[in-house]
Amino acid sequence: PATRILIEEAQAKATRQTLMLLDREASFARRGKGGKHFERVHLTAACFPHSDSRPAEHKDGRVFGDPNLHTHTVILNLATREDSSVGALHSTVLRDWKMAAGATYHSTLAAELQAVGFGIDRIGKNGTFEIAGIDDAIIEYFSARRCEIKNELADAGTTSAASPKLASLITKSTRQKKHVQGQNYQFSSWLDAAKANNFRVEQLE
């Protein structure tokens, strides 16, 4: 439980740092005819942390949502300008900062996890990484939803990188409804599945 809290705090801090970056560098409201002019404003956002992915069938036939700590953030498309009037955000600027925001999130999360004792490796594009001590086989097992989407794309003869719109459509059309389960049940199920795949939490220590 103590380690779990540290992980959750690390992820929350990475989310905050990312929002702070966008608020500082990419937050502008439209002004004037056609919204052609814009001025600096501050974002208003609501964050909703989730601990799992959508349910999917795993290689051993089990069906459950994988451990997948993430945060959904909703940014209000309104902001108060300097003269107290309200305007819509210049969303193009926000989209232009997408890659920088992703890199900030990943680098902050990596630093925070390292600070509490985790190692990181397999650093990929835009700063993505894996936790040292967790091999590719266990990552693949606990990525059933991702594999499900990947297989659907393969059947269509493409990939998410080549066909992002199709990937988004498949993601929406194949997702199962989340089942409301207590965290204790979730954690117990994940531990059982991990042990069945010869993984022990002690491997990370």
Give the positions of each predicted feature.
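Beta->alpha loop/short-helix hinge microenvironment recognizer with preference
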Residues: 1-205
